[in-house]
Amino acid sequence: MIQMTLIQIDNYGPWTVTPTPRNEADLQIMQAELYADLQRQFAARQGLVFFTRFDNMLAVTNGMDLEDHRRIQKSIGNRYPITVSMGVGAAETPYDAQRNASRALQSHGGAQSEERKEVLAIDGLVDEGYVQIAHIDINGITETMTDIVPAYDTSFIVNRVQHFLMKKLIKEGALLFFIGGDNFMSPCNGLEPQGLLRIINEIDDEINVALKAGIGKAPTAEKAANLADLALEEIRGGFTYDLVHVMKE
């Protein structure tokens, strides 16, 4: 079982234009600072946050209980001009877990409801479970793209790869998030290494972009992500010729 938390800024759209539209640079700064703040607080509890849409973020939170979430929620409310609500869900796959978390929060009102504030909606918590995360990157992007084509063209290709990965992984109950550079992370409980290898080969055939992936499996998101990083580094370093390499705690 994997546990996912949806973090949603309360009534954010209306707030950004009340009493008049706020400076866009200030909004971008606040969103970036809020994400960094949440990442720091969830990481201190072995969780991992993905910025997703910035006003809606998703976190893998195995090992975190109601009180952990409540403390983070209150901390944000004390220090920011906005508040956040959270929904927590658990399931066998990450997609189902985030769906349960979303439904739990949605049952308490819409994202732009003036009445909904600092809701903590729990659909389910994981007592004993695990987190499986894949760290995926593009082979040789620096030499083949970054150093020879315009920056925006490289960004376009990275976004295209993300689109293809998301379409294929969601069919397996897995999620995918861009984490910078040419890197993606996929919470993928229930996906076998052979299944991810098949997806990587399909993308190579379809859009001529070669990928590789390290998979980590551990009780918490932070540990699983670290193992995924180490597994990917073994591929990069030539310690294995596999395109998908697994490390477990």
Curated annotation (Swiss-Prot):
Keywords: GTP-binding, Hydrolase, Nucleotide-binding. It holds the Pfam family GCH_III. Transmembrane segments: none annotated. Its EC number is 3.5.4.29. GO terms for biological process: biosynthetic process. It comes from Methanothermobacter thermautotrophicus (strain ATCC 29096 / DSM 1053 / JCM 10044 / NBRC 100330 / Delta H). Catalyzes the formation of 2-amino-5-formylamino-6-ribofuranosylamino-4(3H)-pyrimidinone ribonucleotide monophosphate and inorganic phosphate from GTP. Also has an independent pyrophosphate phosphohydrolase activity. PANTHER family: GTP CYCLOHYDROLASE III. The keyword Methyltransferase does not apply. It catalyses: GTP + 3 H2O = 2-amino-5-formylamino-6-(5-phospho-D-ribosylamino)pyrimidin-4(3H)-one + 2 phosphate + 2 H(+). InterPro entries: GTP_CycHdrlase_3, Nucleotide_cyclase, Rev_trsase/Diguanyl_cyclase. This is GTP cyclohydrolase III. It is an enzyme of class 3 (hydrolase). The keyword Ribosomal protein does not apply. Gene3D superfamilies: 3.30.70.270, Nucleotide cyclase. Belongs to the archaeal-type GTP cyclohydrolase family. GO terms for molecular function: GTP binding; GTP cyclohydrolase IIa activity.
